[in-house]
């Protein structure tokens, strides 16, 4: 679990995810503030149902995306590419995620947007601080970690 621990530690320090969905061959990307749950290996975001990405996702859909910093030096590049599934949360599951999200982003208390979970199934973490092009991969299906 060393790979997942390193990835989780880095993701916990970031706050913006780019997510991409598709519907009938049409692609769309969006940015959102996220809360990362290391135990569930999932992001939680708030987004209105009327947004294009939510409309294309429906209640549940495949998703891919990235999280990255903005370093000015190639040697400091770090970032995640992922694929997984996005779904709108309901009921108690939504309430629990919203409470945690509001702790991370207190201003979100004023928003009524639904809570969505992005369950990560594959993560590739590039970390040039460990050496140029250093990559770590985590796969949910097999618990596999590659360095």
Swiss-Prot record:
Organism: Escherichia fergusonii (strain ATCC 35469 / DSM 13698 / CCUG 18766 / IAM 14443 / JCM 21226 / LMG 7866 / NBRC 102419 / NCTC 12128 / CDC 0568-73)
Domain of life: Bacteria
Gene3D superfamilies associated with the record: Electron Transport, Fmn-binding Protein, Chain A
SUPFAM superfamilies: FMN-binding split barrel
Chain's gene name: yhbP
Protein name as annotated: UPF0306 protein YhbP
Coiled-coil zones: none
InterPro entries: Split_barrel_FMN-bd (IPR012349), UPF0306 (IPR011194)
Family as reported in the entry's similarity comment: Belongs to the UPF0306 family.
